[in-house]
Swiss-Prot record:
It catalyses: an N-acyl-D-glucosamine 6-phosphate = an N-acyl-D-mannosamine 6-phosphate. NCBIfam families: PRK01130.1. InterPro entries: Aldolase_TIM, NanE, RibuloseP-bd_barrel. Pathway: Amino-sugar metabolism; N-acetylneuraminate degradation; D-fructose 6-phosphate from N-acetylneuraminate: step 3/5. This is Putative N-acetylmannosamine-6-phosphate 2-epimerase. Converts N-acetylmannosamine-6-phosphate (ManNAc-6-P) to N-acetylglucosamine-6-phosphate (GlcNAc-6-P).
Length: 221
């Protein structure tokens, strides 16, 4: 899968339960459109969406499950329960929050990575700082993504792509670095790859019409 996405675009097709496009059928259609537009892989949330997207596109999938727990701020594939659920799908890679925050039930992130590898799948580390990226490489993750920059209280807070973190990671770790988070234009995508990103994930700017519409209406205010 890593060979397939190198230098190419990954599109995130997600619509949570409170969003207007929340539907596995709709996400499948969205993924088909992304494939027709040249996406090399899809990042998808939830078992039903993953299964539908795999069936209709046959593209490689980065699978996640977003689930909230009372005893932790981590919600992207937080525990072994979510890993086990994802391993029952045909997703080639599983992404999980690899920040330094405490996991639900005090679970150990290394156990999750080992379980993913034991089933022959790849593991992506969603991180928010350089230090977390370095630790992710030590833990055995196959790639690291800037997904959570700005979403932890101790990381850089910004409304734009964290190109600084991307550059630091590219210079520091040996595993592939994926740029993800707030990429809104083709130019930003190209800049990420020019700075050394192995690949990049674009989500809302392509697959969330309410977000796209708001960018247009905001300029009228």
């Amino acid at each position: 899968m890593l060979d397939v996405v190198k230098g190419n675009l990954i599109v995130s097709c997600q619509a949570l339960s409170d969003e207007p496009l929340h539907s596995s059928f709709i996400m499948g259609r969205m993924a088909i459109a992304a494939k027709q537009g040249g996406a090399a892989a899809i990042r998808a949330q939830g078992i039903d969406d993953i299964n539908e997207i795999k069936e209709v596109t046959k593209l490689p999938i980065i699978g996640i499950i977003k689930r909230n727990y009372d005893d932790s701020e981590i919600y992207i594939t937080p525990t072994m329960k979510e890993v086990d659920e994802l391993l029952k799908t045909d997703c080639e890679m599983i992404a999980l929050d690899a920040t330094k925050r405490k996991r639900p039930n005090g679970e150990n992130i290394k156990d999750l990575v080992d379980a993913i590898h034991a089933k022959g799948r790849l593991a992506m580390a969603d991180i928010s700082t350089l230090e977390e990226g370095i630790e992710a490489e030590k833990l055995g993750f196959d790639c690291v993504s800037t997904t959570l920059s700005g979403y932890t209280p101790y990381s850089k807070q910004s409304n734009s792509v964290d190109f600084e973190l991307l550059e630091e990671l590219v210079k520091t770790v040996k595993i592939p670095v994926i740029c993800e988070g707030r990429i809104n234009t083709p130019e930003e995508l190209k800049k990420a790859l020019d700075l050394g990103a192995y690949s990049a994930v674009v989500g809302g700017a392509i697959t969330r019409p309410q977000q796209i519409t708001k960018r247009f209406t905001d300029i009228l205010k």
